[in-house]
Every structure is written in C-alpha cells, then in structure tokens.
From Swiss-Prot:
Part of the ABC transporter complex RbsABC involved in ribose import. Responsible for energy coupling to the transport system. It is an enzyme of class 7 (translocase). It is a peripheral membrane protein. It comes from Clostridium tetani (strain Massachusetts / E88). The keyword Cell membrane applies. The complex is composed of an ATP-binding protein (RbsA), two transmembrane proteins (RbsC) and a solute-binding protein (RbsB). This is Ribose import ATP-binding protein RbsA. The gene is rbsA.
C-alpha cells in the first residue's frame, strides 16, 4: 500500500540547485523534497538532469548554487563519504559489486570488521551479520558465493543490503528493474515496501511509467535541467506525466510508417545454435521491420548473434539476396551487409572513453583511407558531423566523450555508426531499453527512415507496446523455438504472450 498521509517536514530538501560544466548549465534552480517512508519518483527525459542532481546528493559532484537540508538542517555535501555519513546511499544502474569477491565481502567492502590484537579480518562476524541483514528483507543466499555467480536480481538485493548495512536513511535507486525479470521486480517492490514501512526514503528513477503507479507515492519531474513540478501519483495519469516530461503531448508514441515491401534480403532455414536456437526458419524483406518477441531467455539474442557470426551455428543455412552465405564471424557478416546493435550498448556497442565521433566512425575507417593508408581526417569529420545532424545526436561536439551523453543519444550514435557502413540488414536488440519516452520516438523515426530506404530491420524487443507499435510483422520465440508469426493487423499482446509461453514447462 502506498503511503498517503506524509508527515509535514521533509527528511531531505534541495532548494535552488544549479550546476555548470565548462560554462554549460546542467541544472537550473532545481527543487526536490522527500519525506520519511516515501518513494519519490524522479522523472525526466535523458539529459533532463536527473543523474546530475543525484550525483550532487550522493557526493559525486558538488553543487554550484543552492542549498541542501537534512531534517531541516543545512548540510554541505562535498564527497561520497559525507553523503554516506548523512545516511544517503545510491544504487547505480550499473551495479557495483566486485565479481571476484564473495557476497559477504561485497556487503562489508570499505567497512570491514577486525578482531584480536593482530587486527585480523573477522570473517565469521561478517558472514553471520550478512545473513542477518539478508533475512531482514526476506532474502536468503549463501554469503560465500562469489558475486559473479549470482544473477542480476540477486545482485540488486545485495546492493540494497549494502545500503542498509550503512544505516542509510535515504536510498537512491537508478533504473533498478532494467535487467530484472517480472518475478525479480515483484520481489524488489516487496523489499521497497518493507523499507518504506521502516521509515526509509527512496528516490526511484525509472523510464517505466507503469512502475511509478505501482510503487511510488509522489513524482518530481525535471526537463532540460529545470524543475517542472511535483504531483502525487494518485492525482495524475501516464499521459500527464509524459506531457510534464517532454513539454508536449505524445499523441503518436509509435510513429508507424507504411512502406512498400521488396524482395527478401535475408532468409534463414532451419538455423540452430546449441540448444538455444532450434531449427529456426524465416525471412525479412526490404522495407520491413520484423519484430522479434519472446520472454527473457527465449533465444532471441542468441538467434541474432548466430546470424551475425558472433556465435557459430550448429546447423542450418543463411541466405542473403537468395544466395547461400556461410558467415563465421561478425567481420564476414558486415562484409555481407549485416549490422548488429547489441542490447548492452555500454559493454558491446560503445568505447565509453572515446569521443562521439570516433565511436561513430569506428567501423568505417577504411572508407577514409587515402592511397598511402592514412586517414583523411577532414573527410571523416565532415561525415561524422553529417550523421550527428541526421540522427539529431545531442552533443556539444563530435569530440565529446561518449560516456557523458544520455542513453538516448548514445543509442543514436551507435545507430549512426552502423548505418554509416550502409548495411542492407539491420538487427537491433532492445533499441530503446533505458531510454526516455521522447528519445524513444526519435529512435522509432530513425528506424522508419532506414526501412523507407529499402533496408530490412529485425527488431528484438521485450517492450510489448513497442513491438506492436512499429513492427510490420512479428515473430515470437519460446524456449529457442519459433512459436508463432503474426501480421501487424492481427497482433495483440494476448496473442504474443500465448506464443511466448508455448514451449514453457
């Protein structure tokens, strides 16, 4: 149950917060308050200033203007340690557990306990205390297991326990359900409700608006680095929140574009990969977006990586323009006009410490070589700038380090990288994961533009409205099998789900 009668005095209040980076204003007079035992949603498009504001609160950045109050007492947060001493913890979207440490070692990392005159690590105490802490949120695990051997949902629980172990009074959760299953999300929500009942404040950042109505009490909205307003969840609607976030109504959230279909550009026949992909056959045509739906673990990504040559097929055939092709590596796939955009853009799609421009031109450097194999920088820069403009990548310049861009702009840069090589077949895995509603629409428009040029797109997505909204045709996978095919006209969420569980036990 959501808390309705919030106490009058906020635990945290941020007033008039402003922040500048190299003369560019990232936050402009932002307000935020949160009460004990409340879940406050912090909403805004990518680039709205949410991360910057939370980094100020958690001590990663210092504010340039404004005041922060904890229990009505003015505080000056100058570092992460100071924030933690004030009871503020943050659980980042990219979880921070050290994979080669055990669970109990991760929980006590930085606050290890020692015993005896020789100051020896008190492992027994840390083990037993870790087990007690885990039990407080109804979670059991072998605390001697290495972090690399547990799943994302379990990692999330350990991160929460780390925050609790530090006696946190306020926990910031940044996109906590991005990689969670439905069952893991439900478990997380139970834990959040338990924390609420103990008077702990939660600031909850998510692009999944349905979750806001499930778990949050109030919503604080930012846009373009400015405070837009706050509203109680019970007094608002999804459409109202979208309007607050983007400053306009998204009447057409999924801008479908009808394009005349051409011949099959790609066909696969009885394609298999180990026990993950089982005798799959389909084709995708020029001017078509083929949606690929299914539950997590259904084999969609494995199918994509097998076509792209990242995984070696066990059996079956791949045809491009009716010609049988043997693809044994991504390099061969690219040479045959196939591009693949991974679901994990930060690990597999980008080199985070490189510039936007270098990331975009990375797969196409040969194009800029002159007769002595030297890169023509002027030609490269011009084309990079053209693609930045064409895809509306919001960046101060092509020289900006790409990790500083919002998720939506990073994704557009990856798309620019791949369409720069002029592929005929684009496989895109979870194209809008972790991207705000405004940037999603921009991505859909880019995909529509690509298909209108006579290219074929295979779009893997776990976002059901997205699959229904922009696909021309939908294939559904279940347990490695192709369980169903639906035309745009006949497809519904119910039909997709029926096929998605067709091969489940």
């Amino acid at each position: 149950m959501k808390k309705e009668n919030l106490e009058e005095k906020p635990f945290l209040q941020m007033k008039g917060i402003s922040k500048f980076f190299s003369g560019v204003q990232a936050l402009d007079n932002v307000e935020l308050k949160v009460y004990r035992g409340e879940v406050l949603a912090l909403l805004g498009e990518n680039g709205a200033g949410k991360s910057t504001l939370m980094k100020i609160l958690s001590g990663v950045y210092t504010k340039d203007e404004g005041d922060i109050f904890i229990d009505e007492k003015k505080v000056d947060i100058k570092g992460i340690k100071e924030a933690e001493e004030l009871g503020i913890s943050i659980i980042h979207q990219e979880l921070s557990l050290l994979s080669n440490l055990k669970i109990y070692e991760n929980i006590f990392l930085g606050s290890e306990k020692y015993k005896g005159i020789f100051n020896k690590l008190d492992k027994d105490y840390m083990r037993s205390e870790s087990e007690k802490l885990l039990s407080t949120i109804g979670f059991t695990a072998d605390v001697d297991i290495l972090a690399k051997d547990i799943n994302i949902g379990e990692m999330q629980m350990i991160e929460i326990i780390k925050a609790i172990s530090k006696k946190s009074k306020l926990i910031i959760m940044d996109e906590p359900t991005t990689a969670l299953t439905e069952v893991e999300t439900e478990r997380l929500f139970k834990v959040i409700n338990k924390l609420k009942s103990e008077g702990i404040c939660i600031i909850y950042i998510s692009h999944r608006l349905d979750e806001i109505f499930q778990i949050c009490d109030r919503v604080n909205v930012l846009r373009d680095g400015k405070y837009v307003g706050e509203v109680k969840v019970k007094d608002t609607t999804k459409d109202d929140l979208i309007t607050m976030m983007v400053g306009r109504k998204l009447e057409e959230q999924f801008p479908y574009k009808k394009v005349k279909k051409g011949d099959a550009l790609l066909a696969v026949n009885n394609l298999s990969y180990k026990n993950k992909v089982k005798n799959i056959s389909f084709e995708v045509r020029a001017g078509e977006i083929l949606g690929l739906a299914g539950l997590m673990g259904s084999g969609r990504t494995e199918l994509a990586k097998t076509i792209f040559g990242e995984y070696k097929k066990s059996s079956g055939d791949i045809y491009i323009n009716d010609k049988k092709i043997n693809i044994t590596s991504p390099k061969e796939a690219i040479e045959n006009g196939i591009a693949y955009l991974s679901e994990d853009r930060k690990k597999e799609g980008l080199i985070l410490n490189m510039s936007v421009g270098n990331n975009i031109s990375l797969c196409n450097l040969k194009k800029y070589e002159n007769s002595i194999k030297k890169i023509n920088k002027e030609k490269e820069s011009k084309e990079i700038d053209d693609y930045i403009k064409k895809l509306s990548v919001k960046t101060p310049s092509a020289n900006q380090i790409i990790k500083n861009l919002s998720g939506g702009n990073q994704q557009k840069a990856i798309i620019a990288k791949w369409i720069m090589i002029s592929p005929n077949i684009l496989i895109i895995d979870e194209p809008t994961r972790g991207i705000d509603v405004g940037a999603k629409k921009e991505i859909y428009e880019v995909l529509n533009e690509i298909k209108s040029l006579g290219k074929a797109i295979i779009m893997i997505s776990s976002d059901m409205p997205e699959v229904l909204g922009i696909s021309d045709r939908i294939l559904v996978m279940s347990e490695g099998n192709l369980s169903g095919e639906l035309s745009r006209e006949e497809a519904t969420q119910e039909k997709i789900m029926k096929y998605a569980v067709a091969f489940s036990n």
